[in-house]
Each structure stands twice: as C-alpha cells, then as structure tokens.
C-alpha cells in the first residue's frame, strides 16, 4: 500500500465533491456539506487539517432522485453510485459515490463485489414527527433498518445492542427475509415527509446521530462558502445545525483528538480498484 498522503487524499475527495455538487446543481437536487466538511468550511475555509473525506446531506426526496438519475446522467465510468439493495449489501446505510480510478479497501467491505474507490458519503434527511410516542417508534424502526440494511454487528454502540443484533441476525438468516424487514423498517421510519414536518433528522447516520433533530428551516436552502479553491454548499441554518450536532464547533478539539480517522486495509490514489481484485475479493 502506498504511504497515505493526507493532502493528496483530501484533494481527491475535493475533486469528487466538485463533481457531485455540479451534478446536483445541473439536476436541481439540493445537497450540502455536513459534519466535518461543514465545520471545515467555516473554521478552516477547507478541510479540517486532519480530516480526509467529505460527507453530504440531501433531503430524502432529492436523495431518491439522485439514485435514479446517476446511472442515466453521471460519468459512471469515473464515478459509481453504490446503494444497497436486495442483491447487494455493502454494509452502509446510505449512498456512496466512488472514484473508480482509485482504490480504498475498508475492512468491513473486504469480500464485496463493489467499487472500492475512495468514497463520498451521501446521507438522507427525513421528517421527524412532533409527538414523543411517534418519535420513539421512528427511532425503533431506524435501529431495525440500520441492522438489517448494514447486516453487521454494531461495534461502537455498547454490548447490549451488539448482543441483541447478533441474536436477530442469527434468527433471520435468509437474504429475502432480511431484505423484507429492512424495507418495512425503511418505509415506517421515513413516513414523515420533510415538507410536512417542523423538524428533520438523520436516520442513516447510526444510533447516536439519529437521536438528533434539527429545525427544518435550517435546511430549507443552501448557501455557498469558501472551501479550498472553490465554493461549497452548506445548510442555510448551518449554525443551528452544527451547534445541535457538535456543540462549540468553532473551537479546536484537544491536540490528542486531532487525528485522521483512516480505516483502510489498502489505499492507492493512482490506480483503480479493479487492479487489486486479489485484495478485496
């Protein structure tokens, strides 16, 4: 594996981000940087110095349109859209856009016949019910969706969740039954439409972030801010969103937490993943 050059990885991610944002603009799809990318745009006018990737939010309606339009209109020779379905489990809960001319093999995706290029994560935003009872059920369905869509045990979310998940996956072993449960859960958790809701939530970001809810008005539109050598979209209500999700986001974390979060078995920024089938098959 080539030595990881963080800046080169950032620039590859930026190139992908530019293409993705341009595609969304051309097809009237709303997208915005989220998480570390949004923080980086405001605090550093670019990447957080130790960060290496970009993630985007999209309202659910635009997210589903993206999945339909990509293979029809995008440069799929260069960039693949990967979305789990009945015949493909990629152990993610959301769409990823992959650069086919690179290789970035992640431990949890070894053995999968997918594009193993570096990825942009595209995360949907869904309506959040106002009632506590309905919200609890939405979160329950969100957890069921997370388990049966990703079909991996939650490593970072406590022993009880892991034990329950292991039991459920051992009971429901059939691919068809798992897919049926996953689609039922997805339908139940997404039944609250963004346009009809006062708040929105991120149900595909794992147990911690799915508990967050944000004012819909924060995401009704985007604004463009400086990001490296370009402009990138962030939510119009970025301050409310980032404070709710991360607290005092403009303050640097302690030095010991300023670390890249590489989780890769193999990385090559100059050669496509098809050159390394023996490593990921």
Residue map of PLM features:
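Conserved SAM-binding loop
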Residues: 66-68
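Active-site nucleotide-donor binding segment shared across nucleotidyl transfer reactions
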Residues: 21-54, 58-64, 217, 244-245
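A short secondary-structure junction signal
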Residues: 132-137
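Conserved catalytic core of two-metal-ion nucleotidyltransferases
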Residues: 1-27, 70-130, 150-246, 252-281
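A contiguous, mid-domain pocket- or channel-lining segment that forms the substrate-recognition surface
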Residues: 140-144
